[in-house]
Amino acid sequence: MMPSQITRSSHSSLPEVAPASGDATGVSEQTPQQARTVAFFSSGELAVAFGRTSAAPEQDSVRLLSALQRELDKQHPSWHTVAQLCQSLAEVGTTEQGWHQLASEDQLPALRELLDRCTHRLADMPAAHASHDSLSQACEGLRTARLHQSVARLTARPSSLARAMADLLTLTHLDPETLGAEPPVISSYTLFSHFVRTAKQRTADLNDSLQRQPDAVVSLLRSHADTLNDLEMLPGALQALTENCQDAPARNELRELAEVAGALLQLLLEHDLLPRLEEISIEPGEAPAPGHEPAEPRLTTRQALLKVGGNLVRKFDAYGALAPMDDKALLALMRTPAPHLSPDQMHAFLNKHVLHLTQEQRDIVSNTPLPFAPEEDIEARYGMGFDEKLRLALANGSLVLSEEQLARLGDLPSAATTTSDVVQTLLEKPSSALSEAERDMLGAIVQANAQGQLDAWRAHNEQLPAVLSRSGLPSDVKDELLSLNKSMNAELGTLKNGASLKSRVLASPAMLLALAPLPLAVAFVSKDNSYSSSLVAHFTKNAVFMAGLMMNELTNARTNVDHGLNRYFVTVLANAIVAQPTFARNEHLLEQVGFGIATAVASGAATLGVFNRESIVAAFKLAKSKLSRQDTGNARIPQEDHLAVVKHFDVSEHFAQQMKVATELYKQDKSITDIMNSSLTYLGTKSSEFQARFEVADALRAGLQLAEGERKADPDFYTKLGLVALTASIGAALVMLMKSMVGKADYAADGVWCVSEMLKLAMNPEVDMQKAVQVFKEIVGLNLVMTGFLGVNKVWNFLDKGIKGYASGAAVLTAANLTLPGMVGEVAGAAAGKGLSYLTDKGKAAHQAGRAAASWAGDYVSTSRLGSAVGTLQTAIPGRIAGGQVVAGLYDRFRYLTWSHPAPAPQAAGEP
């Protein structure tokens, strides 16, 4: 289909249209509908048919919706006020700015909810009621605003299928008698005929798509079901337009459109997008009245149960033992060979998706020659070059885009970096709120960031030895960087090829069989029913995790080590310490305070040492470097070599950021296992360490002062910090509920360790909420369930009431441990995070007020005798004011910020 030459209501440019093209007398005698119809025939612009103008709105739609919501929430609303607000909202929808405001995702559910509320109130209100007319006017205003909203969203979509519905709705809102008017009111049918012909072609395409791919099209149209009710008037409107049309070609186009539209109405009825079959006739002249209730999306009982069940299983079984996960699709995309995309090329890749280039246009771009790329230009040599070809083809005139494509190209926000607006917008929306166009954009961004990344990143990492040979760095730093590089390549290899069958099948069963007996034996010999029931629940969950580990192809040695430490180490260590006195029946020793303290200290120290081994090793290295002369490497290397080395590490960080944004956006609409998420988190963390280690070493080599890098913003910081607070409270409560001294000491050490681990996750911006909840489930989950369980048992003591009571209690505890930790962790973390975020926002407001007061005081001081003294103090402490700004803005609303490359302080000596 040829691109339409009639300008649609795109976001880039909207026409300014006069109410009518006739003289002043004619205008004064026209109704608003006639004026809109005349303007539409004169311009051929869809938006004009709905009365849209370029005038600025007198009010803001967001404030109007809020005011309307508050008024309706009152016990006795003022229906006169409601009617005025609704009328104002309808008027805002006729302006260009208001048109776009109503089309936003935030206002879509709000407007529909208000319309439903008013419609139901009107249906319940007697016609003789004093407020009936006001409420009726309110409903009419809301329906008008809803119409503008729906048409704006339909025309904003790149798909011609959605625009077909907007074209047909336009024809139902014209005045047919205006076509029979004498010139000069209607001087030409050219634009009108072209509009009808385009609508016919789009409607035919929509019919074909409804027959071939009904699910996708129905999903696209379902949110507009209430507005589509106006199509019930379409047969009568087309008949009236045909009868009044004075142009023979235009009449033929209208008749052909009526046939295609009739088939469309039947298809819409079959898919429940129109409410009642008996009131829709495709015969000319039979136009049923509008006003039916909107058709809401419906799922069958079976579909609803399957959807709810799938979500619950995913929550309970994030390792993927039973739950259907979407790892395969993301892995397949990452494993697909494709060139690495630079930021500019990624933007162009998205252009290609959003512009919907025809095959002829793609061939033109593909055949456009590129200038010669130097060998050292990694991006130009290994990138796909679509961006450069697209620009060159447009510049030399070989590629001609339609008006719609140009509008999309101008409106497309850059998605080349993780901080781009389009990425942030998609990340901040829940999956259910994503529009069809946003889902298309999401898929394109995931593909651009993920496709071919595994091969490209590994190939890039293989160049590191050659790069380091030009770096001038000392040998110990090179070894450390090579070790980090090896760790990343090993993880990339697992993602590319999967883990060995041996590591998947043998490791987790061996851990369960070898490590579970000792704690269980200690618990049963000591006859501590509370403790033994908790271990039954703990190891049952380990068995479920074991199934997930064995079935997941990404279960490598690192995954098994993490699983063993998180699920076995603390339990086995604590029971190993108390095993000898337990089996020897030395109750006196077990109840001594000193033994309990010694057990807690030994267990806690060993646990913290094992889980913080890397930090401890790094601290020893730092201390050693401080005590001895440190080799900083060659301070003077060629500038060309230095630039090549810096380029290599920057590209490495770019790979990590691409992988992260692909994963985050993919998870907006899909589910991946905790195992895959852990693998990707590990890569991100190691990449950050890799980059940071190089920056420090390079600055020391050159004898420069390392500038403070910008901290990556962490959108999950407050929710993760909420999990830390929850972990601490659970540990304290559990210690209070334990009866024996050993139990108190054991859970005290366990609580300190859990808090330290959750705090490390909270402070790491590479760790997202899914990873934090995964660790919470593994190390705190049982403690969470035990707290409530032992609290109930403290009242009824059912665990000590025979085998039946013990078995029932253990079964309940096991079931709770399998299901609750993940959900409770997410909910509690989110709630605590909101509270912390609120307190921080209040703190920022107080900080701003304090700064304003300080500024006023500073103005006063600067004019007083103290001015010179204050100036001297500020000179002595140059970072005082800037430091406050850094603290206030440490965690803001931005999603991800890349580590800034250090800007070395200028020094004369040591320049490379």
Swiss-Prot record:
Q: Where is this region: Disordered?
A: 1-32
Signal sequence annotation? none
Q: Give the originating organism.
A: Pseudomonas savastanoi pv. phaseolicola (strain 1448A / Race 6) (Pseudomonas syringae pv. phaseolicola (strain 1448A / Race 6))
Major subcellular location class: secreted
Family of the protein in this entry: Belongs to the HopW family.
Disulfide linkages recorded for this protein, renumbered to the chain, are none
> Looking at the record's lineage, which domain of life comes first?
Bacteria
Q: Point to the regions of Polar residues compositional bias.
A: 1-13
Q: What is this protein called?
A: Effector protein hopAE1
